[in-house]
From Swiss-Prot:
Homotrimer. The keyword Cell wall biogenesis/degradation applies. The active site is at residue 363. The lineage of its organism: Bacteria, Bacillati, Bacillota, Bacilli, Bacillales. The gene is glmU. This is Bifunctional protein GlmU.
Length: 457
């Protein structure tokens, strides 16, 4: 098999996005759109990927580190000029080169593989990826002769009335014989209104040289959708989300209302898990089998075990074991580690907290910078007081401890195994194993005093 190369065009300014963020770095379902493109290419057994960068080059290189080589296009002088910048990496090499736009996040590896195969079968010097749409306004048209052979690409503004009625369009993705590509690029002129060097002119140069130029027609226009503004970004995200959600459903996940469920592309979900409407699953979240995530929940870059029930809660960068109950209205902040058979009830917040197996935090609790053992019960209103205004300190609670309601554990503090903290206590010293910790003022009842307070009739 001949060598395969790919050039990804990612140097455009994206002025229509009206954004400080470099255009191709705008995310589509949790991943920058240029990374979608490069990740699809990387599955094609390509020998080298070269990404043409311009504005914001450093940020693009950070996202694609290890996935691509990079060449800078200092001046944006057109698509042919952009590809020519890869001359130092690819010129003179035998093989075929894919040219793909970095703002087409929906293009799939299977389509590019089919394009490569068709190019090889036709023994072409260039093959254009085309598609048919109902309204081709604004797109370059594919002009074929009576035998269906490609003659040229005509831009919409240059097309005759007859040519404008053609519905087959140029998607902007190509496959070239590598040597023929770079030889032709040297002859592309900028003799046009914009004064730019256009890649479709390479097709004309090759045709004039009597080389074979083919066109592979794909079925779906969606894959060729280019993102140039926020409206197109929203459309691409919608289409990508549908693709992601349908893939999960095919793999045994129930999405009660897929049109109202947001799932990033790198999320993994086990079989027989049920995701209700209004759920957002972001980042590299992994959810096991037989879980239920109810409406209003958000889970970000977290690992969730099996048979976990998350009710209307938020989980960020945390780990949850098996058979755990979370919520409603719980908030697991980063670095929470919840072990098996734990209950995290309503209005409970954890942060950098390890919660041991079988422990219950039923309601209205804050545990930050805490290490909690097995089979602990923490009563309503209890707090691990971890911050003194300058420094954070740790609370350690042993196994089989009972913490009564409305207790304050002033860190740093350690509560030993099987200890009992009396309700309403403010614990400032370590509590030994098997001890009762009680720290509150003695109650004093002043008989008859309430009559002088006028608090009731």
């Amino acid at each position: 098999m001949s060598k395969r190369y790919a050039v990804v065009l990612a140097a455009g300014q994206g002025t229509r996005m009206k954004s400080k963020l470099y255009k191709v770095l705008h995310p589509v379902c949790g991943k920058p759109m240029v990374e979608h493109v490069v990740d699809q290419i990387s599955t094609l057994d390509v020998d080298k990927v070269v990404t043409i960068v311009g504005h914001g080059a450093e940020k693009v290189q950070e996202h694609l580190a290890g996935k691509s080589e990079f060449v800078k296009q200092d001046e944006q002088l057109g698509t042919a000029h952009a590809v020519l910048q890869a001359k130092s990496e690819l010129a003179g090499k035998d093989g075929v080169t894919l040219v793909v736009c970095g703002d087409t996040p929906l293009i799939e590896a299977s389509t590019m593989e089919a394009l490569l195969k068709y190019h090889h079968e036709k023994r072409a010097k260039a093959t254009i990826l085309t598609t048919v749409i109902e309204d081709p306004t604004g797109y370059g048209r594919i002009i074929r002769d009576d035998l269906g052979i490609v003659e040229k690409i005509v831009e919409h503004k240059d097309a005759t009335e007859k040519e404008q009625r053609i519905s087959e369009i140029n998607t902007g993705t190509y496959c070239f014989d590598n040597k023929a590509l770079f030889e032709a690029l040297e002859n592309v002129s900028n003799d046009n209104v914009q004064g730019e060097y256009y890649l479709p002119d390479v097709i004309k140069i090759l045709k004039d040289a009597d080389e074979v130029v083919a066109a592979y027609k794909m079925e779906s226009f969606e894959e060729s959708l280019g993102v140039n503004d926020r409206i197109a970004l929203a459309e691409a995200s919608k289409l990508m989300q549908r693709r992601i959600n349908e893939n999960h459903m095919r793999n045994g996940v129930t999405l009660v209302n897929p049109e109202n469920t947001y799932i990033d592309i790198d999320v993994k979900i086990g079989q027989d898990t049920v995701i209700e409407p209004g759920v957002m699953l972001r980042g590299k979240t992994v959810i096991g089998d037989d879980c239920v995530v109810t409406s209003g929940s958000e889970i970000v870059s977290s690992v969730i075990g099996e048979r976990v029930h998350v009710r209307n809660s938020s989980i960020f960068e945390s780990k949850v074991g098996d058979d755990v109950q979370i919520g409603p209205y719980a908030h697991l902040r980063p670095e929470s580690d919840i072990h098996n058979h734990v209950k995290i009830g309503n209005y409970v917040e954890t942060k950098k907290a390890v919660v041991g197996e079988g422990t219950k935090l039923p309601h209205f609790i804050y545990m930050g910078d805490a290490e909690i053992g097995k089979n602990v019960n923490v009563g309503c209103g209890s707090i691990a007081v971890n911050y003194d205004g300058k420094n954070k300190a740790k609370t350690i609670i042993g196994d089989n401890v009972f913490v009564g309601c409305n207790s304050n554990l002033i860190a740093p503090v350690k509560v030993g195994d099987r200890a009992f903290i009396a309700a309403g206590s403010t614990i400032t010293k370590d509590v030994p194993e098997d001890a009762l910790g009680i720290a509150r003022a003695k109650q004093d009842n002043k008989l008859g005093y309430a009559k002088h307070l006028n608090h009731g009739k």
